[in-house]
Amino acid sequence: MMYFGYGSNLDWNDWKGYCERNGRSPDGLIEIEPAWILGYNLKFHYHSKGRKGGAADVVPLNHYHATPGALFELDEDTWKTMNMKEGTRGGYYEPKEVLVVRQSGELITALTYVVCEDKIKQQYTKPSPEYEQLIRNGLANRGLPDTGLDHSMNDAWDHHVIEHLFVYGTLMGGEVRHGELSPYIESIEEGSMQGILYDLDYYPGIKTGEGIVHGELIKMNDVESCLTNMDSIEGFYGYESKNSLYQRTIVPIQTKHGLQWAWTYVYSGHVEENTRIDSGRWKQP
């Protein structure tokens, strides 16, 4: 079974310590990779006696938001241990099925834990420095941003964590649709992502796979307005739709300044192998 962790379970020693104190084996928690939960942001509005302060929760917003964490696989016995640790019997946290983005950009469903409604406080509940550091270290160790943690620590939990968009085709500078993106550009730089680029006649499409696709990384000045317009251009009708031409997802982008997580669009339709662009570049030098 697949599990998405975003709080203290990003720290192996915290998990191992709990298991040892309770006579359980920690070995059934197998980490797969860094991942993102779609449509949720991190929030501190629950006081944990055990943590001596606020404990993390993820709360739903809309599909312009996402929270980083890690994807794990758990065996049946480890699920029982996880339920114990999360206090499901006592009504502290409860499991919830969510949509998760894997490192490749693939979307899957997994379970996570959210705070039970009657344990939620209306005000910001500050976490202890030790608990905050567990999460911060867990994110840093996986190359994930702590922007959402910083927002939550300042009671600005509903701010956007991902403010970048990766484009690789007709939205790039000098291309036919760049004018529709240009009003939303705060900054722009070259970047690349893992994937395979295909020529779909008048525009390209990415599929996940072993390869490198080159493009441009845009920092958006208005995330929701930009993505709303780009969704329309790319034929993305929402994560519940099976009729989208492209799927909006999250991927790591390599730039000369380092790694940056960004939204991008991957093609949903069928492609012929002979349409692959081996150079990974739509705009040739």
Residues covered by each model-derived region:
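A glycine-rich, hydrophobic/aromatic-adjacent loop/helix-cap motif
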Residues: 1-285
